[in-house]
Amino acid sequence: MSNNNSAIVSKVWAFCNTLRDDGVGYGDYLEQLTYLLFLKMAHEYSLPPHNRNLNIPKEYTWESLLQYSGEALEVHYSLMLRELGKSKGILGQIFAKSQNKIQDPAKLYKLIKMIDAEQWVMMGVKDKGDIYEGLLEKNAEDTKSGAGQYFTPRPLIKAMVACINPEPSKTIGDPACGTGGFFLAAYD
């Protein structure tokens, strides 16, 4: 994992610990992080050079979140999740039954600003996978979490993928896929 990715993992994990003190569990935090990252990346894809239209209603875009703070932010984010969950197609599936689990508006604002500071689309698939895997690994190492999850060390993954030598026309599988580390290494 690169130093920049490690720094992002540390920053995001530290914030997770802050929220856990407020009763927000790791799973809820990861869920909220995923919703916010999706919205941020959709915003990035809407800008040049991508210029993609992901059909997110203007009042529920990433930019709309940045316009609020305090209790108004918490109200807007909760409404946004509910309304996006009613959307047709994949957008509705992503946000189905979504709820705001971060009840402290100041902490929600801080999380949004932290996500906004990064250019997520510019990161490679491997970098985003490393960050996600790093968060899961930190959760498993945390004695308070009791996650009971196990992670294959990166050097072992690399060695196994080198032995298998996957090619574009071959099918691979990972029946115990937790973090997707084997798939990311094979993709690489």
Describe these PLM feature segments.
Residues S169-A176:
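Conserved class I S-adenosyl-L-methionine
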Residues M1-P168:
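Non-catalytic, mostly N-terminal accessory regions of nucleic-acid modification and defense proteins
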Residues G146, A176-T179:
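Short glycine/serine/threonine-biased micro-segments
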Residues T179-D188:
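Conserved SAM-binding loop of SAM-dependent methyltransferases across substrates and taxa
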